[in-house]
Amino acid sequence: MNKTCARCQKVVYPIEELKCLDKTWHKTCFKCTECGMTLNMKTYKGYNKMPYCEAHIPKAKATAIADTPELKRIAENTKIQSNVKYHADFEKAKGKFTQVADDPETLRIKQNTKHISNVAYHGDLEKKAAMEKQRGSAEVSDSSNESEYFSEQLAAEQFSQYAPTASPIPPAATTLHQQQQQLQHQQQQQYQQHQQQLQQQQHQHQHYLQQQQQTLPPPPIQHQQYNTAAITPTYQQLQQQQQQQQQQRAQQQQLHDPYAHYQQPQALRQQQQQQQQQQQQLLQQQAIKQASHLYPTATSQQQQMPPPQSPANPQQQALNSYNEMRSAILQNSHHPSGNSVDQYDQPQQQQHQPQQQSTNPTLVAAQQQQSHHSLLNNNASNGGISHSHHSNINNNGHGSQNQMLPPQMRRSAASVVAYDGNSKQQVAAGPGAAQNHLQQLYASPNYAAVTPSENSINVKQHASNGHMPNQQQQHVAGGSNIGKIADYDPLTDGPRVVPNAGRSSTTLVYSSEPRGNQGGNSVYPKRIGSVSDIDPANGIYGSLTAAEQAHQQQKHQQYYQQVQMMQQQEHPPQQQQMRQQPSYSSLQEKQSRQSTAMRVYRAIYDYEAQDVDEVSFREGDVIFEVESIDSGWMTGRVERTGKTGMLPANYVEQAVI
């Protein structure tokens, strides 16, 4: 079938056929619709599937419309996405500069250029130049003279090694040498002044110590030693002060004259070093003398120790006891191991021993043990016992024997022996009872734990005409051997009981002990079972034994019988005959209802109802008529609101009534 031309409607043969704009044309018929100019495939413009030339093609005219935010957004997106702006900038930049990829070298040059331009812009170079000009010209001239002299002096020293004659010192060198001598003279004066100040301080300190020795009674040598050690500077502190002074002098010399070391001849430098060494040796000898004077040796301590004087009056006695306690505290504070020996305790113990041996020979051992105990526990943190109890004497002349006992014995004696203030007679349960009580106290290897507060309590028992029985004193003296850790043998002694364990700190959940061993310790009537025995409706989450269940059933039956008797008394006998007896099943139902009615629970958490058939309650609410309906759920009536519904079993616990 032959095709027809879109313009002339004639047959188009293949030789002159032209296909364009979805139509078939003769080559001569393919012309502009407006002007009739012949077109080809390169010059035509199509509009409405008709050919037009460039000049006559219909063009869209701009129409004024309202500018809305949506149109603005679209125009902005179009501008960003199109390449029109990029091409326009590219065309403008042609011939002006060339774009180059950034590399590290280019970036470094760019950064340096930026710094240079900033410095030039802010005028930092001019500011630095002005500051340099404002500095003193004298310093600049001095530095130049020093540099010139430094170079000349080095050359002269090198030449003097080979030539016998010495080069004359230039005038600048003479002035510098004079300045150096002046500095040395000033430093020597400062050093002498410092030495004089140190001597004055030492003299004042010695004068102060002499005044103290004249006014106060002679304290122990160790006490004086520790006090002076805290006041006077030690040998190490003197060495540190000397080193600091030498460093300061060296820094001053370097600041005033940095080239002084090279300007001095070698002989002069050696003399200065020898002088410094001699001064250091003198200072060390002085410090050693002071230390030996302030810290005497053991032999000098023994020579200087005054003999113990017997107290003449009560005031001197109290003062001596105070000094003894103070020296013992200081001694134990410097000897933390507790192996020190109290100097002033031994003569007093020797004075007390013959008196007590004449009255009661068995009490001497207790007194010796007490003195050893007081030496070991003399610090304030251990609840120490003051030594002043040696001077406490009652009316009969006997020492207060209860105070010479260890703290445990003192408390036991205080609990057994009592004194009546009115009759002033000793009231006790008898020597046998006291002895039994003390035997119970010291029978077990574990003593009662003694806290520092209990140990520091001074139990004073004064009697005008009485003292402790001899049997009790003998037992106290014999049973005061406190055990050590080394004496404990775990194989033979067995486990020890923890002292002062009033109650166990943990709650027993599962135990292998039988029911009878627990006794009255168990609060709830339950036995220890496994996790599978847990019943949420059982209240205390533990299965009851068969005997307890039978006991509860018996109680329920008795309660049911009582209710039935009351009902029979209320109703006439005719109605009782007409009424049928309840069956066994109905009796069981009533019994179960009564058991649930008797079961009372208390809420341990707040709960909000999540469904219609649930009930809300608050912590502490009482819940009655509880029945277990499912695993973890039960029904009950809240007493506060009166509502009945389902509630979670783990939110409540059985109330103990």
UniProtKB/Swiss-Prot annotation:
Where the record annotates domain LIM zinc-binding, the positions are 3-63
Instruction: Note the superkingdom of the native organism.
Output: Eukaryota
- Cite the residue spans of the region called Disordered: 130-151, 164-223, 235-257, 294-318, 332-415, 460-528, 548-592
CDD domains with a match to the protein in the record: LIM_LASP, SH3_Nebulin_family_C
One CC-aspect GO term:
Z disc
Query: Could you tell me which PROSITE patterns the record lists for this protein?
Result: LIM_DOMAIN_1, LIM_DOMAIN_2, NEBULIN, SH3
Q: Which residues form the SH3 domain?
A: 596-657
Instruction: Give one Pfam family, short name only.
Output: SH3_1
**Annotated Gene Ontology MF terms?**
actin binding; actin filament binding; metal ion binding
Name this polypeptide is given: LIM and SH3 domain protein Lasp
Q: SMART domains attached here? A: LIM, NEBU, SH3
**Which gene holds the coding sequence for this protein?**
Lasp
Q: Which PANTHER family match?
A: LASP, LIM AND SH3 DOMAIN PROTEIN LASP
Segments annotated as Nebulin repeats: 64-95, 96-130
Phosphoserine: residues bearing it: 505, 530
Keywords of the record: LIM domain, Metal-binding, Phosphoprotein, Repeat, SH3 domain, Zinc
Q: Quaternary structure per UniProt? A: Interacts with osk.
Which BP terms in the Gene Ontology apply to this protein?
muscle thin filament assembly; pole cell formation; positive regulation of pole plasm oskar mRNA localization; regulation of myofibril size; sarcomere organization; sperm individualization; spermatogenesis
What residue spans carry the Low complexity bias annotation? 172-215, 236-254, 342-357, 371-403, 549-586
Compositionally biased spans, kind Polar residues? 140-150, 332-341, 358-370, 460-475
